[in-house]
Amino acid sequence: MAAPLTAAAALRLGRGLSHRRAFLLRRRYSPAPLAPSPCAAPRCLSSAAHPPPPPPRRLARSGPSRPLAASAATAVSEAQTDLESGPVTASKGRIYHETYGCQMNVNDMEIVLSIMKNEGYDEIVPDPESAEIIFINTCAIRDNAEQKVWQRLNYFWFLKRQWKANVAAGRSRSLRPPKIAVLGCMAERLKEKILDSDKMVDVVCGPDAYRDLPRLLQEVDYGQKGINTLLSLEETYADITPVRISDNSVTAFVSIMRGCNNMCSFCIVPFTRGRERSRPVSSIVREVGELWKAGVKEVMLLGQNVNSYNDTSEVEELEPGKNWELSEGFSSMCKVKNMGLRFADLLDQLSLEYPEMRFRFTSPHPKDYPDELLYLMRDRHNVCKLIHMPAQSGSSAVLERMRRGYTREAYLELVQKIRSIIPDVGLSSDFISGFCGETEEEHAETLTLVRAVGYDMAYMFAYSMREKTHAHRNYVDDVPDDVKQRRLAELISTFRETTAKIYDSQVGTVQLVLVEGPNKRAPETEMIGKTDRGHRVSFASVPVPHTFEGDELRKPVVGDFIEVKITKSSTASLSGDVIARTSLSKFYKNHSSEAHAVAA
């Protein structure tokens, strides 16, 4: 009888066989599995040598809402690594992941990790040098984001292409050449280019195809490329409980809808994420409930156009779309066929069911702020008084070319209405400098809009034309790059002038702050948190009492709500003196009573 094959011999023999046969031989004759590596919070680490990591842990599977634990990866010794045979473990592969772009991409990665965990891929490592699977979740909004992705892909390709040499030199601790998977919007937009990039990438998976990732990775084992970028009219991942990336955080993201119907001329999102579809209210309430049990104190509701949320799944009689109320003076190219439960309905239910949890939302469109939503935000103490109002431009002519559905005047009137209903509201916005055909006069109108409104925060970028968009088909990107950058610098400077006044106005006030962790500038002596309006506040870590419970003094900890008197401001943060620990509802009840007493 012939002697049994070693794993190395199986690999050599497999080189002359089919990919399928070789794969089966390697799996059959591989030695016993090693202990699994633990998971870790995602970070983009350099390729420098890493210190010896602690012993490994495997992720628990005891419940869908349990977060991933965080620790370093297990180093692979020479005795554990057979350079000739490749894999020496039955593990499906350790995962390293990076995410670029918006909060929606962060939440998508949490969905991906949940899908992979349910298929047995339950090990996450903090650096790509220790991984057998590398996920890079991408953004296609601007060229700068895509260039960063290409740079990272070049490095990941180096880890894959030179795997044996990297392991021998101590630059890699992966058990086999890593599979590289590009996820997200860039995968949807540039799938052909990515796959043709000199065998750099193994898997390309669009935002609506994450359930297919385990199968796509298996295709790679058989020598095939794994690709699925099909868009869906139904997929919302409503039945999947995301695996939280930041497992020690008291804040979390919850996706309530996907896609966008607005078709703004500059935006690629409708082409990379598809049409709007909303999760059922019941599934959102369930997920928020699980987060509350896990200790989360603040939830950010996410969607590409979050306030156009429309759940038709739980409404027996759907109302005609003509009843869909837009902000006054705003229009939309998309006509709603049926109206179900709207965003105000969802926010109403969540805020009532979880009175000690704060709720934020992003990213909205100004057209979807009906009065009912504004009054709800005013009346609910746990709905944060920060409204994102992406203007994009202050020129009506530019807004028309952008197909935004409103004028400068309509936008300013909406701002005035919001502030009349919610006097202490904060506003944030998005702006694009150098859009197609933008003149100096139109740019100046944007600067005057920023001064007129006065924003707490803003996201400002130079225009980057995207293929497939209306602008790409119909306009010319005719503003020179140096002009775009100069206008962007002027826009940022103007914004800083106005926001400094807003932060200065907070000095002397008492703010409710959710403690989020140590201040990185002074981690031993200071903590940092966030106010209702999203302002960062630092304060000394000193023992304080509880306002209402009257227990003994103790220092604030992560997850506490505290009262802070603001004593100092800068252009991007506040600092103050901590007064006491408190609760969300009692703080606002107490301050509401004081306000009524002063008024009387």
From Swiss-Prot:
Q: Which cofactor does it need?
A: [4Fe-4S] cluster
Domain (MTTase N-terminal) spans 93-222
Q: Where would I find the Radical SAM core domain in this sequence?
A: 246-501
Where, in this chain's numbering, is [4Fe-4S] cluster 2 bound? C260, C264, C267
Residues in domain TRAM?
504-580
Q: How is the cofactor bound?
A: Binds 2 [4Fe-4S] clusters. One cluster is coordinated with 3 cysteines and an exchangeable S-adenosyl-L-methionine.
| One Gene Ontology CC term in the entry | cytosol
Instruction: Cite the Pfam families for this sequence.
Output: Radical_SAM (PF04055), TRAM (PF01938), UPF0004 (PF00919)
The cross-references to CDD domains, in alphabetical order and at most eight, read:
Radical_SAM
What are the cysteine partners in each disulfide bond? none
Recorded hits in PROSITE patterns, A to Z, give: MTTASE_N (PS51449), MTTASE_RADICAL (PS01278), RADICAL_SAM (PS51918), TRAM (PS50926)
- Indicate the family of this protein: Belongs to the methylthiotransferase family. MiaB subfamily.
Query: What's its job?
Result: Potential regulator of CDK5 activity.
Protein name in UniProt: CDK5RAP1-like protein
Specify the taxonomic lineage.
Eukaryota, Viridiplantae, Streptophyta, Embryophyta, Tracheophyta
